Amino acid sequence: MCGHSLGEYSAMVAANAISLQEGLSLVHKRGKLMEKCPKGSMCAVLNVDLDVINEICSKVEDEIKTIVTPANLNSPKQIVVSGTEEGVDEVINRLKDCGYKKCIKLKVSVAAHSKVMSNTLDQFENELNKINFSLPEYPIIQNVNNKIPNNIDNLKENLLSQLVMPV
């Protein structure tokens, strides 16, 4: 089983790693914590290689001292960039300057799967530790590392990591 980003919680419920109530509780608390983070932005970039996006994001981070990174690796031809408003806007401008025109700004105010979400880690880890996890009855391919967890700590670590890492 697998679920992308928030869908990983659905996969855990379907695999009986957590109950439906626990899944809903975690998703709700995750959302509330994300809302408390600094505002951010996300943009879907189409038909640009990941290497090009990584290079531009890295240069923008270094040059203007901001956070911007590939966040959702939806397909080889659709990658979502996430970070500060300033960082995402600069990546869009540089992509367009290089001739890449397909950049679609998402209607969100959070920078999911980026270091902008770092403030959530300690609190969300506390929430994860309140949940009664079980090993999944069916294999779950985790988002951050593309592996099947072999223990409960792996399940928790992945849910925590996906707040600040690409999925």
Enumerate the language-model features and the residues they cover.
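Alpha/beta catalytic cores of group-transfer enzymes, especially the acyltransferase/condensing modules
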Residues: 14-166
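Helix-rich "cap/lid" substructures immediately adjacent to catalytic or cofactor-binding pockets
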Residues: 1-2, 81
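Gly/Ala-rich beta-loop-alpha elbow adjacent to hydrolase catalytic centers
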Residues: 2-11, 19
